[in-house]
């Protein structure tokens, strides 16, 4: 084995020279230079400084403006809540551990940080699944005269949390475990060791199939059908230009969110799968650190995409920030988000 396994940890560094120490007790400077840990700390500080105000502002603006409380926006707000969990429960911990170059909070802190990171990522993924299904049902209309209402949104929210907890909670109760990964400053599911005492391999397979592959299949199926339907409807002019434009704008926003999710999380999932299928092989700490920390940027992109692509929300945000006045003078209410409930692009 090209790494060193201990109680509740696996360090990707051979202990032939006797330098490996527990990542819960000693700085890991034998894995990387001090400046590299400083870079990680600075990066986490940046994510916190951006992630908290952006996601909090998303929630606050929606509470302040009743016209933003639409069923589709409930799902988007769910993403903001998940991101705040990641920022407050995970990023602050990782910032502090990076400053000390080891996981100073011990196995319990590792469990909490790993749980919040996994929970936030899974809520984001399953929220995108719900958004994809909503787009498919509203645009493709497999069920005649179906409207995505408040009850459907609440059911979608419940699904995201149930599925996210079904992925993030098992390592806390004995099915797999959370351990420090990469440079040992953040925690994730143990892809590195078989750990038969906690049935680790079965959990990783379950996680990749149920909580990654199946959601991806659903998302790609829904958008494949959606693209075909929108093209057919546009070609036959079955709906007004205004309705088609509204649907395209909402769909474009959600598709960009999916693409951004893939950009952030596929590298991490790919590296994790490689490590799982090549346990004991030689790889350095940076190999997992870069995709792991890059995936954390997902806490920022969703609200940024939402703010940039939703004119109604952008106007409400400016009104809130400027004490009730929109400096752009644009108070248009009828926008993409408000049209989502009533738009009906029929299939060919």
Curated annotation (Swiss-Prot):
Residue ranges that the UniProt entry lists as topological domain Cytoplasmic: 62-73, 134-152, 225-252, 309-348
Any GO molecular function: 11-cis retinal binding
Any one Gene Ontology BP term: G protein-coupled opsin signaling pathway
Family annotation (InterPro entries): GPCR_opsins (IPR050125), GPCR_Rhodpsn (IPR000276), GPCR_Rhodpsn_7TM (IPR017452), Opsin (IPR001760), Retinal_BS (IPR027430), Rhodopsin (IPR000732), Rhodopsin_N (IPR019477)
Motif 'Ionic lock' involved in activated form stabilization, residue range(s) on this chain: 134-136
Modified residues (N6-(retinylidene)lysine): 296
Main location: membrane
Modified residues (Phosphoserine): 334, 338, 343
Similarity-based family: Belongs to the G-protein coupled receptor 1 family. Opsin subfamily.
Protein name in UniProt: Rhodopsin
Species, as recorded: Mesoplodon bidens
